[in-house]
């Protein structure tokens, strides 16, 4: 009877035998989320959402609270690892055509937007110099909305400038949004398992499936262990690697930093925003840089799902990756030549990927039909 139970348990989740390491990032994201919620809870115990005390409370956590520096640095570094994993997860989806499972892809895009909002609110909380000015610049983009802009901005701020009510509501939102992320993640996973995982070939996996446990579960554990090892290495040897030096100074509304920029994981969107000299145009481009992902399920034209056998599409995909990295790099630089030109060129390349992919799909279809 025990053998029957073991066989039943191991066959509860049959998975395609050929899914690669790129399929491990979902479980790594779940590990990141759990780590963020645990460390965030301990930080919230000691944090004070008040503009006079917020910066001091973070200093108090790192200096006086036992193991507080570990909690604070784990929370910061694992946020960066979270975004590395999610960007890799999205890139895998684009490469292997996983967006054709529309419900999963659209729920994933909703997750990405929620995650970005959560990270933005979290970045404001320490009330450092860069936190304050990044919040001022980004929330001020709402004023670009015709007619309603100023009213919406005042409503979000809770006054006529970023002040105590703003910090309080940002803390409340930063605390509640991870629970919304958990709910959306559950929806994402349920929708995925109603149809099952895809595989690198883009073919139906039903003909060759193996139990998820132990084969893929051990592979997941290996990748999670590797990620945690990297996390602990950064924590031990270079905990401030990803922090902005400006954020070690308390927010001062009277002094503007020489170069205002958000965390590295938002730089691609910030670079696109900055490359357009018009405020409304830049805001729309910023929104579109993320929301354009929702168009991919509806613009797929190729006969084959995966890019594995489409060399022209592969060139386009790797151009997108290079473009993403270049925009991130230029957005971290001051607004001056040659960075303005590079930023504008790479922004055009970024959006071109989503326009050229369906056109290239048609071309590849014709090439295949000609060869046949």
Swiss-Prot record:
Pfam families: Cytochrom_B_C, Cytochrome_B. GO terms for cellular component: mitochondrial inner membrane; respiratory chain complex III. It is found in: Mitochondrion inner membrane. Belongs to the cytochrome b family. Component of the ubiquinol-cytochrome c reductase complex (complex III or cytochrome b-c1 complex) that is part of the mitochondrial respiratory chain. The b-c1 complex mediates electron transfer from ubiquinol to cytochrome c. Contributes to the generation of a proton gradient across the mitochondrial membrane that is then used for ATP synthesis. PROSITE patterns: CYTB_CTER (PS51003), CYTB_NTER (PS51002). PANTHER family: CYTOCHROME B (PTHR19271:SF16). It comes from the Eukaryota. The keyword Transmembrane helix applies. It is a multi-pass membrane protein. Binds 2 heme b groups non-covalently. Its cofactor is heme b. CDD domains: cytochrome_b_C (cd00290), Cytochrome_b_N (cd00284). Heme b b562 binds at residues 75, 174. It comes from Naja kaouthia (Monocled cobra). GO terms for molecular function: metal ion binding; ubiquinol-cytochrome-c reductase activity. Keywords: Electron transport, Heme, Iron, Membrane, Metal-binding, Mitochondrion, Mitochondrion inner membrane, Respiratory chain, Transmembrane, Transmembrane helix, Transport, Ubiquinone. One of its GO terms (biological process) is mitochondrial electron transport, ubiquinol to cytochrome c. The chain crosses the membrane at residues 25-45, 69-90, 105-125, 170-190, 218-238, 280-300, 312-332, 339-358. This is Cytochrome b. The cytochrome bc1 complex contains 3 respiratory subunits (MT-CYB, CYC1 and UQCRFS1), 2 core proteins (UQCRC1 and UQCRC2) and probably 6 low-molecular weight proteins. Heme b b566 binds at residues 89, 188. A ubiquinone binds at residue 193. Heme 1 (or BL or b562) is low-potential and absorbs at about 562 nm, and heme 2 (or BH or b566) is high-potential and absorbs at about 566 nm.
